[in-house]
Structure formats: structure tokens, C-alpha cells
């Protein structure tokens, strides 16, 4: 049975599912519909391109490579970490459809030992140029799925008011002596792009 989490919750995934070795982290959202003139015309969704990405940190919570933001990030322009232990499954340009809008696969057993945490975040592509923000998004969530059994382990619904914000840190996987924890976050920022978000973790 999946566990519904709130902001700041932490669970031990390895204890929840014995033998857990691979997870799929799914992130989803819906665009708020905008109504036509006087509400008389058919409503259409906002054309908002949200991008999910993973940030790779050391055991102190900093980027594993202080000299290259790209080498610390798995995203639409860098879909796979060398060796394939962390893979972005592709960019969804519209957020249309049910379920996960973007997914990031993690082979927990194969994640290099120098990685102490994997943070999952979402930003709006060209948000400032297009004058878009997360107040135009609804039903945002992050969930963790047992990849082998295809069963959901936990879910965090990002239900706060994020109006004016262009990036969210949804949660993260944290390596422990017992395996891996998942911790929710929910912090929001006014970021121009992915680099702005990743740079938060520079020393």
C-alpha cells in the first residue's frame, strides 16, 4: 500500500520493501485551464513546459562536481548518468495526459558510492520570457514506484500555493547505512532555468 506523505516527511524505502533495488520516480502536474471571453468559449490549457530533473549530491549535500553543473544533473539535455544508474525517461513538453508527466529511473544498487543524495526538482522552461509560474499549475505530485513490481511506494502531493514561483524541489533519495530514504521537500524558487536551481547546491 502506498504511503501519502506531507512536507518534510521521510521514510526508509529499503525497510518498506525488502530487496528494493530499482525505483521509478514519477513527477506529474496539470495545467490550469484558461477560459475564453466571458467564459463562453471552450476552455483551453495553458501551454506550459515543465521540466523534471535530478541533482546529484555528495554526503554533505553539495554537488558532486563543483566545476560542472551539467555533470551533476540528469535532465532533458543529459538523459543518463554514465553507467545508466540514473536515467531521465524523456521530456514532456505540455504536461498533457494522466499519470506521470516525466519519470526518472534509479538503479539504487548501481548508484556510484560518491553520490549521497539525489534531489528531484521541476522548473518551468523559459518561465520569465513566457510570464509563467507554478500558480498556473495544479495537481502537482512526486511519487516513488518499485520498478520491478510496478507498485507505488509513496506519494507527495505538492498542494501549496506556488504563485510567482518558477521552480520546485519536490523531494529526494538519501543514502543511509540501511539503504535509501525518501524525503519530501516542497521548497519553491524564482529561478530562470535549471542552472539556477542546481547552483543552490554549490559550496
Predicted segments, located by residue:
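Intrinsic-disorder/low-complexity signal
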Residues: 1-203
Amino acid at each position: 500500500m502506498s504511503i501519502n506523505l506531507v512536507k518534510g516527511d521521510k521514510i526508509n524505502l529499503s525497510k518498506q520493501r525488502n530487496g528494493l533495488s530499482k525505483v521509478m520516480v514519477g513527477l506529474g502536474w496539470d495545467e490550469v485551464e484558461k477560459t475564453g471571453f466571458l467564459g463562453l468559449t471552450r476552455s483551453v490549457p495553458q501551454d506550459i513546459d515543465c521540466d523534471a530533473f535530478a541533482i546529484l549530491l555528495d554526503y554533505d549535500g553539495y554537488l558532486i562536481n563543483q566545476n560542472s553543473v551539467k555533470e551533476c544533473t540528469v535532465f532533458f539535455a543529459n538523459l543518463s548518468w554514465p553507467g545508466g544508474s540514473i536515467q531521465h525517461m524523456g521530456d514532456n513538453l505540455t504536461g498533457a495526459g494522466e499519470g506521470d508527466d516525466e519519470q526518472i529511473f534509479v538503479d539504487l544498487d548501481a548508484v556510484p558510492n560518491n553520490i549521497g543524495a539525489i534531489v528531484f526538482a521541476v522548473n518551468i522552461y523559459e518561465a520569465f520570457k513566457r510570464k509563467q509560474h507554478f500558480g498556473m499549475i495544479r495537481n502537482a505530485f512526486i511519487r516513488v514506484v518499485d520498478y520491478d513490481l510496478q507498485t507505488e511506494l509513496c506519494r507527495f502531493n505538492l498542494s501549496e500555493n506556488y504563485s510567482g514561483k518558477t521552480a520546485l524541489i519536490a523531494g529526494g533519495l538519501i543514502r543511509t547505512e540501511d539503504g535509501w530514504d525518501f524525503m519530501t521537500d516542497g521548497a519553491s524558487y524564482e529561478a530562470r532555468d535549471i542552472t539556477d536551481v542546481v547552483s543552490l547546491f554549490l559550496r
